[in-house]
Amino acid sequence: MNEKLPIVYVARHGDTAWTHSGQHTGFSDLPLTADGELNARMLRKRLQGLNFVKVFTSPLQRAARTCELAGFGAEAEVDPDLVEWNYGEYEKLRNAEIVAKYPEWDLFRDGCPGGESPLQIGERADRVVQRLRKLGGDVLLFSSGHFIRVLAARWLDLAPGCLGRYLSVNPSSLSVLSYEHTLDRPVIRLWNDDRHVAAQTQTNVGRQNQCSVL
């Protein structure tokens, strides 16, 4: 097959204060830190030269600012479906605080009281996937970590929560969804690639978690 298959580039927003503190950041609209802004600019270098039929960003400022600093603010369209998981009562809490009360809790299985279930966030991801598949060209998205994991699962037609606990998505990282050979074979081509991130904030964990599927 000689026809080029569409590619979806998915960028996670840069660091916020709660990225470093480990607090669940769903609808709380936090700005980027100085490192977050720096790394968003490094993402711009990584994406330079690529052309997209559409660019979409979450309305949350951490994603929208990353989009702007990456060089796509003027052309990006806001898509409310790209917002992060609604953590409800668990917003602002650290994972350790939650499991101290509920040791068996698993976000990707149980969701959050007062927030979204895996099924509900999966429905949002489905709407995004449906729109992407109608566009027929390369697309760039700016979103948040847990939503990106659910989006990848739904791109592959897997249950919303089945991949998330096994995948990492670092700040300012780039992942790539596409197809293999034909449009009925969706694949993950690249995952959690943050090689472009500034060296002074690049962590060993980031390098260890990077996974490329060729």
Task: Name every feature range the model reports, one short phrase each.
Residues A100-Q120:
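Short glycine/proline- and acidic residue-enriched helix-loop micro-motifs
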Residues L69, V150, R154:
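Active-site signature of alpha/beta-hydrolase-fold catalytic machinery across serine-
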Residues V8-T66, G114-D126:
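Loop-to-helix element that buttresses phosphate recognition and phosphoryl-transfer chemistry
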Residues N2-E3, R41-Y102, D106, L214:
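Phosphate-coordination/substrate-recognition cap region in phosphate-metabolizing enzymes
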